[in-house]
A protein has these predicted regions:
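Insoluble glucan recognition modules
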Residues: 1-188
Length: 188
């Protein structure tokens, strides 16, 4: 315990703070230089989506601005951008994929790529590359720094269909701290 991570939208010049609890009389914290300190507020100079990782045990933090989250189709290397909706959730609804054929269309594997002020990372399944199990945990995500077309931990579309092309999807990618980091891909 004592560690916290959040993805959130912040507005330039608008004060924000972190609190130790959502109930009772929480301790308030702000950022000063490279440290987490009690009381006060912090601001960002640019409106954007930010990730903050805070270690209250040692009073330290890291941050990055998240500029884009994409669904990444492995074989075709197609990137489909997901707009940020709020509360650590990126979502694209009623999106029809077109223009794929052959192997570009037929391979069911995918993952997510995140672009940020610290570079590009991938979000993939916690377990090794395998077909869906029907268990919610199959869709839990972890961030990886090795960004390549073929890696372990790709996710497989479920149900498997005859390609991605000419189908409509709802795609949700959630890094909301209240739940496991997960995603959902619905074929309509």
């Amino acid at each position: 315990d004592g560690e916290f991570e959040i993805y959130t939208k912040l507005t330039a010049g608008q004060p924000f703070k972190f609190v130790s609890s959502n109930t009772g009389s929480p301790v308030e914290y702000s950022l000063s230089g490279e440290k987490v300190v009690e009381k006060g507020t912090s601001t960002v100079t640019k409106t954007g989506i930010y990730k903050y990782y805070i270690d209250f045990n040692i009073g330290a933090f890291t941050t990055k601005e998240v500029t884009k989250v994409n669904l990444f189709l492995n074989w075709s290397q197609r990137k489909i951008e997901l707009p940020y909706k709020g509360f650590g959730i990126w979502e694209l609804t009623n999106h029809t994929i077109t223009g794929l054929s052959g192997n570009d269309n037929n391979d069911d594997r995918y993952k997510f790529r995140m672009e940020s002020s610290k570079g590009e990372t991938e979000w993939r399944a916690i377990n090794n590359d395998s077909k869906p199990t029907g268990n919610d945990a199959y869709y839990y995500m972890v961030e990886k720094t090795n960004v390549e077309q073929w890696t372990n931990n790709q996710i497989w579309k479920n149900p498997s269909t005859t390609g991605w092309n000419d189908k409509t999807y709802d795609i949700m990618f959630s890094l909301n701290p209240k739940n496991e980091y997960t995603h959902n891909l619905v074929i309509k």
